[in-house]
């Protein structure tokens, strides 16, 4: 039997405790061997952030240092051109049975992605509820967890305002943000 591998795509700008909680809940409930944290290389759905892919890769490595459930993957960072999940899943397919981990907000928008039918064909999908977006019906597994009201944009806002971010990100992520002078 092939290992079940969770795939969590994110801008990782920065990764936060909500990502960690989702990965831990999914790993336990879905019997995942590991969860790949896949920082988006070149976003296809929004303008690229000021923090380039290598900066966001280092943040993914930092969260993986604090949360052993994660393994940071460079699959999108190293691939030229826009990042599309259908392509990412194709590249990761040899690793095992893939389970794409999504928040309910992302799942609700799945049909707007490039080649959503290929995404569905290349993996199982597991969905966790996000604040403000109830779990939609559909052909997916459910990740039971308390919704965590944290966002990367809130972390960036707090850093810019000089407010604490302790408890919103892991210690290694906070240290990387401070060391690199990010979001100022």
How would you name each of these model-derived features?
Residues 1-184:
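Nucleotidyltransferase catalytic core that binds NTPs
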């Amino acid at each position: 039997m092939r290992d079940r591998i969770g795939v969590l795509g994110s801008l990782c700008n920065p990764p936060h405790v909500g990502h960690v909680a989702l990965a831990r809940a999914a790993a336990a409930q879905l019997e995942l061997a590991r969860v790949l944290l896949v920082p988006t290389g070149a976003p296809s759905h929004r303008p690229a952030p000021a923090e380039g892919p290598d900066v966001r890769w280092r943040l993914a490595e930092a969260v993986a240092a604090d949360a052993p459930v994660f393994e940071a993957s460079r699959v999108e960072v190293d691939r030229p051109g826009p990042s599309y999940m259908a392509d990412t899943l194709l590249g990761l397919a040899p690793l095992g049975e893939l389970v794409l981990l999504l928040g309910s907000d992302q799942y609700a928008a799945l049909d707007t992605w490039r080649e959503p039918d290929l995404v569905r064909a290349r993996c199982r999908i597991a969905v966790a509820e996000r604040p403000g977006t109830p779990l939609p019906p559909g052909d997916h597994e459910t990740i039971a967890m308390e919704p965590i009201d944290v966002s990367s944009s809130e972390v960036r806002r707090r850093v810019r305002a000089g407010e604490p971010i302790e408890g919103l990100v892991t210690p290694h992520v906070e240290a990387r943000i401070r060391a690199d002078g990010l979001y100022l």
